[in-house]
Amino acid sequence: VKADLPKKQKGAVAIEFAMVFIIFFAVFYALVSYSVPLLMVQSFNKATAEAVRRSVALDPATPGYDAALIARAKNTLREQLTWIPQAFNFNANNASDATVTYAGGLLTVRVHYSTDKLRQVIPFLVLPGLGSVPALPANLSAQSSLQF
């Protein structure tokens, strides 16, 4: 003989499941939606630091040193960020995504990626009382500098 739950208990189980599912989904969505921007920012930090680090190896006696230094930093930045898929619309050659400057002996490598581009890949939820999830700044950015 199979023992079955009374109807009142079946309804309680359904309500409990609905509440647990909402909490589970919220945690899962937050984990997924925040991990991609965090991964990108860490990659930007590593790429800018590596671009500056590799530029140090360039001989200052090289003809056209300033241009060669900027070119080396840009190439390194591009190499380090090749893993970013095309869907993210990131272009290290584009001045709106990355800049390399050398002025007064200061080499600065910057990456600034618009969150609007990220919205094309990750769906942002707008929750009443909380706002947009994930809550991100207007730009994901990183910068490394070195005084020569």
Give a label for each model feature.
Residues 2-78:
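Alpha-helical assembly-interface signal, strongest on the long, hydrophobic N-terminal helix that forms
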Residues 41, 50-148:
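Short, conserved structural patches
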